[in-house]
A protein has these predicted regions:
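Flexible, acidic/histidine-containing loops and adjacent segments that form or flank the divalent-metal
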Residues: 1-4, 10, 81-242, 329, ...
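Active-site metal-binding motif and surrounding structural segment of the metallo-beta-lactamase
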Residues: 28-31, 40-89, 264-283
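Structural recognition of the beta-strand scaffold that forms the well-ordered cores
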Residues: 32-35, 61-65, 87-91, 242-246, ...
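Conserved beta-strand hairpin/beta-sheet module of binuclear metal-dependent hydrolase folds
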Residues: 1-57, 226-252
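Extended hydrophobic/aromatic segments used for targeting, binding, or gating
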Residues: 244-302, 307-310
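Active-site environment of divalent metal-dependent phosphoester hydrolases
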Residues: 40-41, 68-74, 95-98, 146, ...
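Short, surface-exposed basic-aromatic patches at helix termini and helix-loop junctions that form
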Residues: 51-55, 77-87, 259-267, 291-302, ...
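C-terminal regions of proteins
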Residues: 18, 284-295, 302-371
Length: 371
């Protein structure tokens, strides 16, 4: 099956985002899929890009919002407003209220009250949902096991999403004891002042030497519960071409994706294409999970066995992390970052004007030290 995956440039400086367009061969020519939309401007650029290459009446078979963070969702609204989308896949937090209720600290909350709070707090998601309904698009929630074109959703499972929801940044306080008992306590993300402090540390960042044999990336990184709710997609395009799209998934989501793939009989370590999660953050991956997904570290000079793309602005000081790129290189990846330019991976289709084969980023012998 012919297919192509386009990573469009999104965001500036410390505000990266995602916007991906997938085209794949079908019985009636081809189908289009859009995954996330980045910010408002990038969402408009996705609309223009599709109109330019496929016409003003182009049909998008499926549009998927991986999670509710603004750097993925703001542009998604523009995509639904500007394109003929048939099926929309997005999580609606308020519908998870009944299942999430036991994991909130306030035991006086009712499912109805909680749903109202969630719908009010996640007004952008509600607005996107409203656009989809107004334009007569079918709306589905993407949970593990569902099929979307040539892709299968590996994560999140509906029950896991209900446990993660109380730990989102805009939800009422979580019941930590209940979540620890459920085995999935992550915690709320850091506040605004903590993020400012992190940026100050970044400017004074230390660099350390890294070799092929001495991997400095560590297990145990922690990302937000919202990121852990990201939709992870396993694509099988026949002829041995397998694709893994990860959104902003972290260790939990990736580990659960591995378990789901194993139960479903989907091979790991045999991908042609992998998305590096969360713009190349070291909080989302570690050696153990990468070994499970990609395979072990290869001897230096072994060559490349798959492509690994990452969305990252060209002027972002923290994304992608060099040690993360090195980790993918060690395991056989040809690593490509957008960094202000659209990048395309294709099988069977000719390159669109402006695209050409790209070379892998090199291995870095100096990487960011941990704090």
């Amino acid at each position: 099956m012919n297919f192509e995956i386009e990573f469009l440039p999104v965001g500036e400086a410390s505000k990266p985002g995602d916007a991906i367009v997938v085209r794949y061969e079908g019985d009636e020519g081809f189908y289009l899929m859009v995954i996330d939309g980045g910010n408002v401007d990038s969402g408009k650029e996705v609309v223009s890009h599709i109109h330019k290459h496929y016409g003003e009446k182009a049909i998008v078979a499926n549009a998927i919002l991986t999670h509710c963070d603004a750097d993925h969702a703001c542009g998604f609204r523009e995509i639904l407003q500007g394109l003929d989308v048939r099926n929309v896949w997005m999580h609606l937090p308020w519908l998870a209220a009944p299942g999430s209720l036991p994991y909130f600290a306030d035991k006086n909350l009712t499912a109805e009250t909680l749903a109202k709070k969630l719908r009010a707090e996640y007004d952008l998601i509600d607005e996107i949902y409203g656009v989809a309904v107004e334009r007569a698009m079918k709306v589905f929630q993407p949970f593990a096991g569902q099929k979307i074109g040539p892709f299968t959703v590996l994560s999140p499972d509906k029950s896991i999403y209900e446990i993660l929801l109380p730990q989102f940044d805009r939800t009422p306080d979580a019941d930590q004891a209940a979540l620890e008992a459920a085995g999935l306590w992550i915690g709320k993300p850091p506040g605004f002042l903590a993020k400012i402090a992190d940026k100050a540390v970044l400017k004074a960042e230390k660099w350390v030497k890294e070799t092929w044999e001495n991997e400095r990336l560590k297990d145990g990184g922690k990302t937000s519960a919202t990121n852990e709710s990201s939709v992870v997609l396993y694509g099988d395009f026949s002829s041995g071409h397998r694709v893994l799209l990860t959104g902003d998934a972290g260790h939990w989501a990736l580990l659960l994706s591995v378990y789901r793939a194993q139960r479903s009989g989907f091979p790991m370590q045999q991908f042609s294409f992998v998305q590096i999660p969360h713009h190349g953050s070291r909080s989302n991956v570690g050696p153990t999970i990468l070994n499970q997904i990609l395979g072990p570290i290869l001897p230096k000079g072994s060559g490349q066995k798959f492509s690994a793309y990452v969305s990252a602005p060209k002027d972002d000081e923290s994304h992608p992390r060099r040690m993360v790129l090195n980790a993918f290189l060690r395991r056989g990846g040809s690593v490509v970052a957008t960094q202000g330019a659209a990048k395309c991976y294709n099988v069977g289709y000719p390159f669109k004007p402006g695209y050409k084969p790209v070379s892998s980023m090199p291995f870095s012998d100096q990487v960011e030290d941990y704090d």
